[in-house]
Amino acid sequence: MKTYNTDEIKNIALLGSKGSGKTTLAEAMLLECGVIKRRGTIEAKNTVCDYFPVEKEYGYSVFSTVFNCEFNGKKLNVIDCTGADDFVGNAYTALGVCDTGVIVLDAEYGVEVGTRNIFRTTEQLRKPVLFALNQIDGEKADYDNLMEQMREVFGPKVVAVQFPVQAETQRSEERRVGKECRSR
């Protein structure tokens, strides 16, 4: 087993409302880091993090699960936290040992009550937060409205560091249609 210096270890909590995509993000991370060869899905009941029978039965995380992987020479210790309100204590506990929180938002539902509560906790614990937007290609997702909502709820410090491809495509299409309407 490789030995890491403390500055090479990052402890991250995946946070968010139930069904926002935390476990799906965990699967993508494990795949990208080469820990698994095939990404599991909630529907197939074969994810690394949801292995208890009750989680497979319910289709969502009941317990927080720890996994680790190496990325760019850094060891990532990640806690996939449950988003169910009944088990939110697991998320609070995870934040106590993590350096950073990654709050996953389902773009179709926007900022949910559970997301607000988790964000408040990260502020109280003075933990830096990164937002990951999931389901951005969903039928009801509106990237621009979601960003506006996030700035209203979480403050003006919310900044996009990556833009979804379809958001630019959507804006380009809106500009094209607008030009056509004006030229008539």
Residue locations for each model-derived region?
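P-loop NTPase switch module centered on the Walker A-proximal segment
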Residues: M1-L105, V111, A160
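Cysteine-centered loop/knuckle micro-motif
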Residues: L25, G178-C181
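P-loop NTPase catalytic nucleotide-binding module
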Residues: M1-S20, R38-R39, D106-R176, S183-R184
